[in-house]
Amino acid sequence: GGGRASQAVFRVSRGPKSSADISGEIAFALADFVNSHTQAYADGKATAFTLASPEGGREPLMALKEWLSVGSDHDVFASGSWNIPVTYLHDWPDRYIHTTKDVAANIDPTKLKRAAFIGAAQAAILAGLTDGDGDTLVSLMGPNIVMRTGELMAQTSELGTDDRKAALRGHWSIEKRIRHSITSYVPN
């Protein structure tokens, strides 16, 4: 997903684990959707969503999904004081950031179009949720729960029993928080 000029990797970051929210699951699902369609496009396969600009690159997005990425203005709003769910779409590392070469000409129009799609689609989904969407949001969590649980098991494989149990308690607390956040968007 790195642009030719900046050689950066595109990332979809969600808020901190302390304020985990279903909006992050939606952002991750959209990243997977865009990754899949742009990979198909780059492979020369038919897709309804090429998400390519005539002036931009044709490579797949290959967006990485991650928890909170600190170091920008959104940190204040995502922190525990405000606790606002955030999705941060960004390139990192970007060799030109905060230099004299940090100019619009170094932004790949295709990557910008794809980022705009993810942001606009997430906003439209969140704004359009109805009482009947609760089960859909719960099912959206499934693949990410499996992925996160697998990552945790690998990360804690060499820990002692007590430390591993503590990590699992923290993990399931976060997953429960995400599940509970659905009621903020879909009351029933």
Residue ranges of model-derived segments:
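Secretory-pathway/membrane protein signature
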Residues: 1-188
